[in-house]
């Protein structure tokens, strides 16, 4: 079906690669450029803005400073860059074959973060967080994970910096994605299903709801409880917080350089959104241009209709976890007691969102859409059969939106440029694809 256009396609660049020495050396902090400050996190004991000292039991000082920093750029430590060089800069692809099948005048580009050792964008922050913890004498990290991308990324990072790693993996994904468990174990991590018998809160949930699928909110509570209870242990979070979003901005910085090589700038930038880190990673560099009046690219968050915090949640203060142990964050939320259905995009089953992403959406600087699981997998299969890469279910939400943007351009004849973040591969999600092909998706 491609024969007639082979010559034309071969003359256009498909893969845009940066040299290692072109890798960004700084993270971009959008807090420096927002028209007004984001609302501060609140201490759950007083409901007053939380002090840095109150966060020290669970986070290292360097990450607390980054969380509250208003500096526009923060230097990436050389030790972190050394590990980044294993896979960064990551490639930017032009989706020629998908464009051909869609017969759209739109140009579609995707940034592929699945080339990292753990197979997703999560390694961009896990390496940084493990490094800063190691520097301050932390010996052990605890964390939650949804589909397992974050848990495996942190396990890898802890292995590099000689830290122990305890992962509380949301129960539904623990059984849906067994090879993510294997990967966590391979890199030296200890992974258990959440809720678990290893914490007081986990035991409470299991007693009250023995058949619960679990949630990221529950897993966060367990990981925080564990960190507080053990010496030389800190908690590590894979999304939501400012410093996590900060570390992901290498994605967008590379995209801008790569698109400049082919004299392109996106009209729309798309990322799936659970906690918001991969969306912020690809989108905030373009938000910066918009705030400076240079360009006006739309930035679109794509979430599952089964967990639609941005599209149907309330913008208010809420806890980041189910047990009410974390600071209160101003964000779009479905409520911290919310337990979403056990969809296959386990990494997007979070009740809230990044305060940065939430503020940008509330002020109209970002927009949000949601899709159901069936139409997301339809897009994933179409992408795999054209571009050859098997996408993670989470990343496939961005693909669905990109395809719809291209089809809309087909209707209007608009020659728009679409950029989306393919945040991870789906090699450990094949059982989910099996469910799709057998008609057994929820």
From Swiss-Prot:
The modification N6-(pyridoxal phosphate)lysine is found at residue 122. Its cofactor is pyridoxal 5'-phosphate. InterPro entries: Trp_synth_b-like (IPR006316), Trp_synth_b_CS (IPR006653), Trp_synth_beta (IPR006654), Trp_synth_beta/beta-like (IPR023026), TrpB-like_PALP (IPR001926), TrpB-like_PALP_sf (IPR036052). One of its GO terms (biological process) is L-tryptophan biosynthetic process. GO terms for molecular function: L-serine hydro-lyase (adding indole, L-tryptophan-forming) activity; pyridoxal phosphate binding; tryptophan synthase activity. It catalyses: (1S,2R)-1-C-(indol-3-yl)glycerol 3-phosphate + L-serine = D-glyceraldehyde 3-phosphate + L-tryptophan + H2O. Pfam families: PALP. Keywords: Amino-acid biosynthesis, Aromatic amino acid biosynthesis, Lyase, Pyridoxal phosphate, Tryptophan biosynthesis. The beta subunit is responsible for the synthesis of L-tryptophan from indole and L-serine. Belongs to the TrpB family. Tetramer of two alpha and two beta chains. This is Tryptophan synthase beta chain 2. It comes from Methanosarcina acetivorans (strain ATCC 35395 / DSM 2834 / JCM 12185 / C2A). The gene is trpB2.
């Amino acid at each position: 079906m491609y024969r007639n256009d082979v010559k034309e396609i071969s003359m256009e660049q498909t893969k845009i690669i940066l040299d290692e020495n072109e890798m960004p050396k700084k993270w971009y902090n959008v807090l420096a450029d927002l028209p007004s400050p984001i609302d501060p996190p609140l201490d759950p004991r007083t409901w007053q803005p939380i002090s840095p000292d109150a966060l020290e039991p669970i986070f290292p000082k360097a990450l607390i400073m980054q969380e509250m920093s208003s500096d526009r750029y923060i230097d990436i430590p050389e030790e972190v860059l050394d590990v980044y060089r294993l896979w960064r800069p990551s490639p930017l692809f032009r989706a020629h074959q998908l464009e051909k099948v869609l017969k759209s005048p739109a140009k579609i580009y995707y940034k592929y973060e699945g080339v990292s050792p753990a197979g997703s964008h999560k390694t961009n922050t896990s390496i940084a967080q493990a490094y800063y913890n190691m520097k301050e004498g932390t010996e052990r990290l605890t964390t939650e994970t949804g589909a397992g991308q974050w848990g495996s990324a942190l396990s890898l990072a802890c292995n590099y910096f000689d830290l122990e790693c305890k992962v509380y993996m949301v129960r539904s994904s623990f059984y849906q994605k067994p090879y993510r468990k294997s990967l966590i174990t391979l890199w030296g991590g200890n992974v258990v299903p959440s809720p678990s018998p290893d914490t007081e809160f986990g035991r409470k949930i299991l007693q009250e709801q023995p058949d619960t699928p679990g949630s990221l909110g529950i897993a966060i509570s367990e990981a925080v409880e564990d960190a507080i209870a053990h010496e030389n242990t800190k908690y590590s979070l894979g999304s939501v917080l400012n410093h996590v979003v900060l570390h992901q901005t290498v994605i967008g910085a590379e995209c801008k350089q790569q698109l400049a090589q082919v004299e392109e700038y996106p009209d729309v930038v798309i990322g799936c959104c659970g906690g918001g880190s991969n969306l912020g990673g690809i989108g905030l560099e373009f938000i910066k241009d918009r705030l400076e009046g240079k360009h006006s690219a739309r930035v679109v968050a794509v979430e599952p209709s089964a967990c639609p915090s941005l599209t149907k949640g309330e913008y208010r203060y809420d806890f980041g976890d189910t047990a009410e142990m974390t600071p209160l964050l101003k964000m779009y939320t479905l409520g911290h007691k919310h337990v979403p259905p056990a969809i296959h995009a386990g990494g997007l089953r979070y009740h809230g969102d990044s305060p940065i992403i939430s503020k940008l959406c509330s002020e109209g600087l970002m927009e949000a859409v949601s899709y159901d699981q069936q139409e997301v997998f339809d897009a994933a299969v179409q992408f795999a059969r054209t571009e050859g890469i098997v996408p993670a279910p989470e990343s496939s939400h961005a693909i669905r939106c990109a395809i719809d943007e291209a089809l809309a351009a087909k209707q209007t004849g608009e020659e728009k440029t679409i950029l989306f973040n393919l945040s991870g591969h789906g090699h450990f999600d094949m059982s989910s694809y099996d469910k799709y092909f057998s008609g057994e998706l929820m």
